[in-house]
From Swiss-Prot:
Cross-referenced Pfam families: F-box
Repeat found in the keyword field: yes
Cross-referenced InterPro entries: F-box-like_dom_sf (IPR036047), F-box_AtFBL13-like (IPR053781), F-box_dom (IPR001810), FBD (IPR006566), FBL60-like (IPR055294), LRR_dom_sf (IPR032675)
Protein name, as recorded: Putative F-box/LRR-repeat protein At5g38386
Organism: Arabidopsis thaliana
F-box domain: residues covered: 1-47
Keyword annotations: Leucine-rich repeat, Repeat
Domain of life, per lineage: Eukaryota
Signal peptide coordinates: none
Length: 403
């Protein structure tokens, strides 16, 4: 012990950092100098199993738990505000929850850089929220620290700055796959992702997209809500995409940027979700701006009838009806969620009449439950009309029944 006593304080603290806190506390009783040094140990490893033995009676365990909590309180009080690198805590039992919160706050205030917690509680425990905050790290710095990142998922993120217009930039030269779903409290968003190949973007439309670089995009699934903002800059950034999906809300948001809609020169497959409460205002210009489109997938045909969708569908009778379809090079048309209404049948006939390159049409029909039989038989008129279309057209029309 005399040899150890001759060592400098810094070296003794380093040696003590390899001991558990219980072992360091036991050594500290050897002398006043050792007791003072424990205040500067940079690592704390605290385990209740060092003190609590489960074979003892419950009454004794409760007393020992109190001793354990008092021990941790004394160690933290002895250390005061000294810097701390690592804090490891392993404990169990619901009686610790309030005290644990104070311990975590203590080490967080002291700037702990590594927190190792293993805790079991009888009831739910909400951890001190500042554990998950880092005031020195922002999102852009975080991405720059990941130069080889290829996939990023941002799912239901709530930005802290609720009272300001927050701008977030997804900037990564290596990123290939990006999934974004519901990022709350943002005003603008930028994409600087030149290597991005796949984008799944489901969120509220932003007020602006100051930077939007995705020139190598291969596939995109876009689902944007609230038709109040012009997303033309975002659309222009994905103009090189080959496979594209638009949700029902996105199609209506696109109606705000029809005049600035880019030409999707590489697009081969376009999928669009439709619903009766949303219009097709953007459909005519969208089809005209896909000069090499081969496959068109319409998930449902019924939509809200407006004056501006008339030349893409059979909803409105006018002389220029079908004008946007006549230049559309689509060869394969898939119609999903077909309900068998006469309105849908008229639209199918409309596509057969005005899509000049159409070679194959696949109609998916789901059987519905019936009150008298297990399934309702497909109305004979639908089968007859499909057969009639096959005779009058060069297009192969298929009715696929499922359910």
């Amino acid at each position: 012990m005399d040899h150890l006593s001759n060592l400098p304080d810094e070296l003794l603290c380093h040696i003590m950092s390899f001991l558990t806190t219980k072992e360091a506390a036991l050594i500290s009783v050897l002398s006043k100098r050792w007791r003072n040094l424990i205040a500067f140990v940079p690592n704390l490893d605290i385990f209740d199993c060092d003190i609590l033995h489960w074979e003892v009676r419950k009454e004794e365990r409760d007393d020992i738990r109190q001793l354990f909590m008092d021990f941790v309180d004394r160690v933290l009080a002895l250390q005061g505000n000294s810097p701390l690198k690592k804090f490891s805590l392993c404990c169990g039992g619901g009686s610790y929850s309030d005290r644990v919160d104070c311990w975590i706050q203590n080490v967080m205030v002291r700037g702990v850089s590594e927190l190792d917690l293993s805790m079991i509680f009888d009831t739910s425990y909400h951890m001190y929220p500042q554990v998950f905050e880092n005031k020195k790290l922002n999102f852009e710095i975080f991405l720059r620290a990941l130069p080889a990142l290829e996939e990023l998922v941002m799912n239901h993120i709530y930005w802290k700055e609720l009272d300001v217009n927050v701008h977030v930039s997804v900037s990564s030269a290596s990123l290939k796959t990006l999934t974004i779903k519901c990022i709350v409290c943002l005003h603008t968003k930028s994409f600087d992702t030149p290597s991005l190949a796949y984008l799944s973007y489901s969120d509220y439309a932003m007020g602006d997209y100051p930077v939007a670089k995705m020139e190598n995009l291969f596939e995109a699934r876009i689902s944007l809500f609230v038709p109040e903002d012009d997303i033309s800059r975002l659309m222009n950034s994905i103009r090189n995409v080959r496979y594209l999906y638009f949700s029902r809300d996105t199609l209506e948001v696109l109606s705000l940027c029809c005049e600035s809609m880019p030409v999707f020169k590489n697009l081969k497959s376009l999928s669009i979700k439709s619903v009766e409460s949303r219009g097709w205002q953007a459909m005519p210009v969208l089809l005209r701006n896909c000069p090499h489109l081969e496959t068109l997938v319409l998930e449902a045909l019924l939509h809200h009838v407006t004056d501006k969708c008339g030349d893409a569908c059979a909803c409105v009778s006018r002389e220029e009806k079908g004008r946007s379809l006549k230049s559309c090079p689509v060869k394969v048309l898939e119609i999903k969620e077909f309900q068998g209404t006469m309105k849908e049948m008229h639209m199918i006939k409309h596509f057969l009449d005005y899509l000049p390159c159409l070679k194959e049409m696949k109609i998916s029909y789901m059987k519905k439950n019936d009150h008298t039989t297990q399934f309702r038989v497909i109305p004979q008129v639908i089968a007859e009309m499909v057969e009639h279309y096959n005779k009058l057209s060069n297009c192969n029309v298929q009715l696929v029944v499922s359910g």
